[in-house]
Amino acid sequence: MAADAPSRRGLGRGSRIKQGRDFRKLRTAGQRMVRGCLIANWLHLPGAERSRLGVVVSKKVGGSVVRSRVKRLLRESFRLHQYELAQPLDLVLVARPSIAGRKFADVERDFLGTLRAAGLLK
């Protein structure tokens, strides 16, 4: 498998944003775009070797099963397309309630549309 191809497994620890301070930094210092069922906050990381993803899904979206599914769909969209990003960045995706019940293709289309509109893809 090529070095830049998506792996078959999920995102590793180094590819996820977990700390509250990182989420706050993106919210205050990062750029923001609202499109479709997603809100994207991002901050470019010059010199970083990989991009990282954080996902926020509130209880307004649905119960725990729905929220977990939405998180999986967003992480998978990022995993498949992370090598298409123009440069490494921290990206936080906030799911809006309209995402509940959507199929993977719809979520992926909104994800790519958001990144494309923000100029984050190669």
Where would I find each of the regions flagged by the language model?
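Positively charged, solvent-exposed patches that mediate nucleic-acid binding
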Residues: 1-122
